[in-house]
Every structure is written in structure tokens, then in C-alpha cells.
Amino acid sequence: SKQTIKIQIKMKQNFKLFAALAASAAMMFSCQQAEDPTMDKAQEPIVKTRAYGDKTPKVTIYVETNDVNPLNAGDYMLSDGTAYADIVEFFAANLNKETVNGVVRPTLYLNDKMTNLLENGGAATYVAGLQAKGIKVVLTILPNWQNIDFTSLNDTQADQLATILAYAVNKYGLDGIGFDNEYGGTVTSVSGSYGNLITKLRAKLPAGKLITLFQYNTGGSSQINATAGAKLDYVYSDFAYYNTSISVAGVTKEHYAPMSINLGNYYSAYQISQYGSYAYDLTEAGYGAIMHFNLRRTSERNQLSLFNSIADGAWEETVTCENGNRPQDWTFVPSGYTITYAEATAQ
């Protein structure tokens, strides 16, 4: 029966997990230190890139660019030769504001660490470098304590912000925009603002670009009606093993991640095993995504056992790490960089 098969698979997952844990104890630092045996050309593995639509559930990895090089997210590879991550979110650019002739306009602010990941040719390294492995790169937008957020935009401001975000996607060769509605400060809600912004952004983006949303504490999702929610590609649950409660109207399970993991935490062997079991469950149930937040360098956390447990549960694959310990090797810009509506609409 299917239940018997499921039990057998879970037993196999646990066996593989404990074997992997024993192996990883001996190999903990191999990701950044060990050298592969020398191969001749005939023996060298072929690097493959999987078409984005071929794997489900998708894996999204958020990278805190304030202290981690996003290229580390592309170093984790499945046993079929393709990337473990399907989407990498650069976390985060900020929703700021300016006043023009007495009228408040939204702006997009790249902080000192984010600026040269995208500006001054940075996108050719940090965005295109991930895309070359078949990974979609999304820029997450986060309010910034300026008393403005995605729930407080009038129609004009929503249109201006959507224009700025679509411009940024084009300027930097990004694959989409992600929303996380936290840290807005004191705001006055405008009915339907969040959904209006999503609708306007979808209309301005080329076909195939992504819009994602992290439903942290639901974050204003009550403002998103079913029509707007259906325009989202992926919604990620608040941190959970397996949270099937979708708080955004119009979002189906194929576009939802019930599993969302903070990689900044330490996890026991039992917890790692549980994540593998839930990865199996959500795959069988037809959910569309798994989310990882706050990827760390391998010198800080050994995430390989966790990724292996999830990959085994979801696709019966294993994961290896090519490096994972890349430093912040770009120059910081103290003033950051601001994209205004004027720049986004300049001819």
C-alpha cells in the first residue's frame, strides 16, 4: 500500500541520515578545505543546469547580504549535477521615501552592502553567476522604519513603486521581486494597498518574472485579495516544520512553502530527520516550495546534513558542497544607492 511504501521510504531516509551524519562528522570542513583527486579530461564530471520548471518542490534560499556572499547559495549541488537552490533571494533592499514638491514618493534603497552586488557591474558576478547554474535571482524588498510600507501606499505611490521595482529587475537582470512587510514604522493603512502593488508590479514585469512573499506574522496579507494573490508565484510560511495555513487569499498549495527554516539556528539529528520526513510529506501533498532563510558560510554552520535530509525526502537525491565559504569580496559603499521614480522613468 502507499502507507507501507511511505513507511519504507522514511525508514530509508533515517538510515541514510545517520550514515550521512557519521560521514559528515569526518568531512565537516571538506567543503572549504579538501581538494578533489586529479582527473584527466575524460573523467571530469559534466556540469549540468536543470531547466527551472523541472523540479518540484522548488527550494528558495534567502541570503542576508549584509554578511554573506550570495554565491555560496549556488555551491550546493544535487547528485544529478544541478543546483540544490532554485531561487536565491538577496535580502534585502529597502523601501524608503523622498518628498518631491511636498508629495511623498517611494524609493528603492540599496544599503552599503547591497549596492555593489548590483551596481557598478556587480550583477554580472553575483546575479549572473547564480543564473549560470540555473538559479533564479530575486531581490527582496523590506520597509525601513520610514513610516511607509506595502500596506500604506495610495494608488499613485503603488504605481510609482511598481515602476521602480520593474526598472530594477530590468537594470540588474534579476528574475523577480520578493516582498517582506516588516519594519515599516508608524503607518496609516490604505485599503487594498498591498494587493494593488502586487497587481501593478505584475502588469509591469515581463512574462516569466517572479513575485514572492514571505508571510512573516502575516505582514499585511489581509490586504491582498484573491485576484492579487493569484499573481504571486510563491508565498513562504512563517518559520515552521510544516505549516499548511496559507494566509494570503488566492494562493494555492502549488505556490506555497509550508516548510520554512532559519539556517542561523542549530538543529539536532532528530530535527534534521524530521525536516526530511516533512519534505517527503509536502512533496507527496503537492506543495510547491521549501524555504531556507539566512544561509550561513560553512565556517559558521554545517548545513549539508540538513540539505541532504531534505533532498532525500523530496527527490531521493543527495547534496554536495563545492565551496560554501566564499567571503564578502566586494567593496562596500557607505552611502548606498537610491533608485528614485525619476531615474526609473528617465528617457
For each feature predicted by the language model, list its residue ranges:
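Bacterial Sec-dependent N-terminal signal peptides
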Residues: 1-41
